[in-house]
UniProtKB/Swiss-Prot annotation:
This is Ribosome maturation factor RimP. Belongs to the RimP family. InterPro entries: Ribosome_maturation_RimP (IPR003728), RimP_C (IPR028998), RimP_C_sf (IPR036847), RimP_N (IPR028989), RimP_N_sf (IPR035956). SUPFAM superfamilies: YhbC-like, C-terminal domain, YhbC-like, N-terminal domain. GO terms for biological process: ribosomal small subunit assembly; translation. It is found in: Cytoplasm. Required for maturation of 30S ribosomal subunits. GO terms for cellular component: cytosol. Pfam families: DUF150_C, RimP_N. It comes from Psychrobacter sp. (strain PRwf-1). The lineage of its organism: Bacteria, Pseudomonadati, Pseudomonadota, Gammaproteobacteria, Moraxellales.
Amino acid sequence: MKLSNKVTQLTDIIAPAVAACDVALWGVEFLPQGGRSLLRIYIEALPEDKAADKQVTIENCAAVTHQVSGVLEVHDPIAGEYVLEVSSPGLDRPFFAPEQMTDYMGQTINLRLIQAVGSGSSKRRKVTGKLEQLDDKQLSVVTADGERYDIALDNIDKANLIYQDL
């Protein structure tokens, strides 16, 4: 889940604008796509708002879009045209940092890895399973068939929650 230099630069530029809208910045994706890039910003309710069962609204997304557009116009960090999307992370939320997974212990996550883990027939680069353990260096996932994978955090390319209706 190492962020690219461009994503880190964009995050540093837009974080204050997002905070000014009274929401938390969950993560940033930047996808250069030839003539038109995509900048996707995920916002989350502040912890105190989540405690009061408040969610991100369309009005929050519109406010962040307005604020961030102004900041990006001034700093101009993206060459060429781009599309700006602002939304909540949703039910199948992507994780951008290990600490974001803490609240989802015991839930099912999907991981795309840089290097395959396991051995023999259980060797894989994609792992889906219950998040059993997380520390500052690795996490442990148990798959539906009972296989346990201990995965170094720096081996994770992408991670997201798998929504399951309880």
